[in-house]
């Protein structure tokens, strides 16, 4: 049996799609030192190469890819989107605007100076900012008719040039951002690691190595005379056992009767107490605890330790600092804080926002009581609410179809903005109503990433046929423009953050990377700083930047 692979690929669009995806993802996993291409650029390069060999199919059939991607971006941003305009989020919003306004202005100017067309200028900006939403917003503006091209301009060539400009400039954008993140603090004779350590010391944040997470364990002790002398007749509230030991007294047996103590309890000799705490807290217990006989009793030790992810929902909690939660009063232990899928350093001054996820452990009833006070326990079901997902997707498309006329000019939102609005709404409602619109994070990530990669395959195959011609004519111009657009906005944002906002350099670098929505650079900077402190800044700008990048793509294609 003779199988002609070339013919098979040219005749089977679905097979071609997944072959390009598989090859691109394989290339994306290749690592040179600490440098990795990333899945989107790996798939795009593969698609351009396959397109140059003559493989193609109708890119319009792959519009579902970018529609799913932008809808999922909206869902992820929803819980934190509105909060970004409140509190200290205004600083982060300013940094995002500095990056975007300067990038759009420079892209417009360099595009005209180098004679780049609509597609190349906008694609170059998307790559220089390492921001796929720019590409998505521009393509949708063209497809929806929002951006009307002048007579004589080839629509298909503009679409092709979007992907070519993006592919040429992406590596410039990624490498320059990583280099600037390391170089700019050094020019001020500041060390990123020292800046991160300064914040950690000021705010009482442990390093990643110091915050190894364990489940609390239960041990029981019989109260002896030495412990009675130590308590000096004080009740549990006055003693503050947790403040001094890191453990909570969850249960007491007195005269054979088990009880859950309140703050008014006074320990008596012969009491048997069950302590809940991390292993290292038990190891550090005062000798007055350990000198009493340790008790191994099934009923006394029969406490159900639970670890749950609690989503912040309460209006009374959102906007408060972590220290104001007083978790010790609930007998609970905080293991992690996650915002916008980024693990945040556990710092007492961090301001909580709706949608934040607190990973909390402790006795089960107390964890659930805490969850009722501040929000709800994240659903662990793997079943998605597809009805809500599809309904809001439909609403997004309908929003995009709405048009308005001013005289002879007619324009509409387009699918990208419409789906962003509906996605943000679904994400916001999900953060406030736990049983509504639930989509497991893994499913959301897969849908978003697959949608993005399918979109990349479509534009890559479409543009690949003329890739050599584009590179020989405009390749060096695109690279030069990309360098300018990548570097100058970062420098401007750094100067604003350092000298106007007076931000800590570790937080500032993280915020700039978030404004560029560049996850790979964030990983490198965290490694360089030997801390997750920059993630605080990244989470502050990432959500709003993802949304405004899409709008910037639309604006750029309108200006070009």
UniProtKB/Swiss-Prot annotation:
Keyword hit for Membrane: yes
PROSITE patterns in UniProt: RCK_C
Family matches, as InterPro entries: AAE_transporter (IPR050144), RCK_C (IPR006037), RCK_C_sf (IPR036721), Transp_YbjL_put (IPR023017), YidE_YbjL (IPR006512)
Location relative to the cell: Cell membrane
Topology relative to the membrane: Multi-pass membrane protein
Gene Ontology terms, MF aspect: monoatomic cation transmembrane transporter activity
Membrane-crossing segments per the record: 8-28, 37-57, 66-86, 94-114, 161-181, 386-406, 409-429, 451-471, 478-498, 539-559
Domain RCK C-terminal: 203-292, 293-376
Biological process per Gene Ontology, one example term: potassium ion transport
Signal peptide stretch: none
Keywords: Cell membrane, Membrane, Repeat, Transmembrane, Transmembrane helix, Transport
Gene Ontology CC: plasma membrane
Coiled-coil stretches: none
Family according to the record: Belongs to the AAE transporter (TC 2.A.81) family. YbjL subfamily.
Protein known as: Putative transport protein VF_0889
Species the sequence originates in: Aliivibrio fischeri (strain ATCC 700601 / ES114) (Vibrio fischeri)
